Amino acid sequence: MNAERRNGAQEPIRLSDHFSYGRLIRFTMPTIIMMIFTSIYGVVDGLFVSNVVGKTEFAALNFVFPFIMVLGGAGFMIGTGGTALVAQQLGQGNKQKANHTFTSMVSFTILLGVILTVIGIAVIRPVCVLLGATPEMIEGCVVYGRVTIAFTAAFMLQNVFQSFLAAAEKPKLGLFVTVAAGLTNAVLDAVFIAGFRWGLAGAALATGLGQVVGGVLPLIYFLRPNDSLLQLEKKPSLEIKPILKACGNGSSEMMSNIATSLVSMLYNFQLLKYIGEDGVSAYGVLMYVQFIFIAISIGYSIGVSPIVSYHYGAQDYTELKNLLRKSVTLALTVGVALMALAIAAAGPFAYVFVGFDESLFALTKHAFQLFAFSFLLAGFNIFCSGFFTALGNGAVSALISFLRVLVFQASSVIILPLFLDIDGIWWAITVSEMMAAIISAVFLLAKRQRYHY
């Protein structure tokens, strides 16, 4: 019995371990909580803006937010794709190569973040006009957008390090960093919005400074000597081959992020058409709660992916089967629980954001009761996409994400209202998750022989 067990401490978990349900939950729990805190950024902004600033400004924030996520989504691509590559290299016993690849990913993230910042600030106004922002919303969209986009590089770094901290066997450090970033955002929201009355500019600045904490603290950690599996090299590098491979492999996460943002824009367009600004506000509340619920599935996927990549790289196919079986069971179990919670708590969730407006509250509560059924299969679909990314099959992962978010959901948002009116918009996501689950199951069965799970 080792010293840790004699002292009553839990044995540290390694990527090379065999994983029971308890061990799997223990390892992924920090990344799950980490993603929940990350999702709270927008939620806290929304709470303060809706209750302190006003309904029109709340609609403006929700309207421009998808475009901001498109820019920052490249961080998810680099993080998930790069982590799969680095974890496989660690599984093959090549730590030096893993560190060099890791350094290239971080260097590329910073460079791309700066480029996207310049582009985003330049085009934010015409994009908002093109997407149909009302005259009352346009200035709020531009103010919130420009300030938030200024922090794109930090936002991308935060997304990248969320994945790499799990691969470095430091998920608890990732949790600490994200909690610190979330608390920074929440406290500054209170100061800038409720205290200084800076409105949307204050909300955006609070979010941006929170992202600086989330992006810079891990950067400092990996630049200094540390006891993790990964270490940034002193000299920045941009090795094109692994960068392209990581981007290709992680394209599903980028695709999912962009597609989600595009579909959100489509939702806003349809809601403005059918019921006006109140529809956009109601959808914003749904998105905030969905951010938190889906963060559980995304956090699990981020946490389990380096384990999958490691065992695939080590050719331990027995453990690969074990990870798949347990992960699918967990995803479906959590899906049932989240669906039940969402249906039962639709009223309280709506009241927190829009309790000040009776008609908007009624609309939001009804919408959420329909929207809630989507949580049943969402976690399964997210895991399946992440599973194929971890195996290095970015094409299948991207196809699942593309069909799930863009094709199935976009077509449902357009077609269902023709038959079900406004309720068709709220049912669209559930229909898309059902169709995506069929596709995900087909790919899992079709690829069994190739990946030996």
Located regions from the model:
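Transmembrane alpha-helix boundary and packing residues in multipass membrane permease domains
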Residues: 31, 35, 47, 84, ...
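Small-residue-rich hydrophobic transmembrane alpha-helices
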Residues: 58-118, 155-174, 282-346, 378-400
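Short alpha-helical transmembrane segments in multi-pass integral membrane proteins
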Residues: 1-28, 86-153, 195-251, 308-374, ...
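Residue-level hotspots within pore-lining transmembrane alpha-helices
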Residues: 37, 41, 71-75, 115, ...
